């Protein structure tokens, strides 16, 4: 007759703390695993938890073209790879998102390029 889960649970519940410690060490050795507890921090507050998450993707938003519209169109073309007409339409339709879901460094570089061209930019 095979040993069932209930038989194992009954045997484990009858063991002392020292015997359980030895059993855990035997499992670690036999199966090459660690029984160390993983500490998981829960959210500190209900509504405040999402705000505590660090963003990894950012959107570059063109608020306005400023005085140097041609330079801003060129910068938009460099950043997005759009054609001349599409880039002009994007600049004319400001405020518009220039590029979405960019890493922080790329978003900052794109924003800097647009600002240098004379645009008003926001990174979200």
From Swiss-Prot:
GO terms for molecular function: mRNA binding; structural constituent of ribosome. GO terms for cellular component: cytosolic large ribosomal subunit. Keywords: Ribonucleoprotein, Ribosomal protein. GO terms for biological process: translation. Transmembrane segments: none annotated. The keyword Iron does not apply. SUPFAM superfamilies: ClpS-like (SSF54736), Ribosomal protein L7/12, oligomerisation (N-terminal) domain (SSF48300). Homodimer. Part of the ribosomal stalk of the 50S ribosomal subunit. Forms a multimeric L10(L12)X complex, where L10 forms an elongated spine to which 2 to 4 L12 dimers bind in a sequential fashion. Binds GTP-bound translation factors. NCBIfam families: L12 (TIGR00855). Forms part of the ribosomal stalk which helps the ribosome interact with GTP-bound translation factors. Is thus essential for accurate translation. Belongs to the bacterial ribosomal protein bL12 family. This is Large ribosomal subunit protein bL12. It comes from Ralstonia nicotianae (strain ATCC BAA-1114 / GMI1000).
């Amino acid at each position: 007759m095979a040993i069932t889960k209930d038989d194992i649970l009954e045997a484990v519940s009858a063991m002392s703390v020292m015997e359980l410690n030895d059993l855990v060490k035997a499992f670690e050795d036999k199966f090459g695993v660690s029984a160390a507890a993983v500490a998981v921090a829960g959210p500190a507050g209900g509504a405040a938890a999402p705000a505590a998450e660090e963003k990894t993707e950012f959107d570059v938003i063109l608020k306005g073209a400023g005085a140097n519209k041609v330079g801003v169109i060129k910068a938009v073309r460099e950043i997005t790879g759009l054609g001349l007409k599409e880039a002009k339409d994007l600049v004319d339709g400001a405020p518009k998102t220039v590029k979405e879901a960019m890493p922080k460094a790329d978003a900052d570089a794109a924003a800097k390029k647009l600002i240098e061209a004379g645009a008003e930019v926001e990174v979200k």
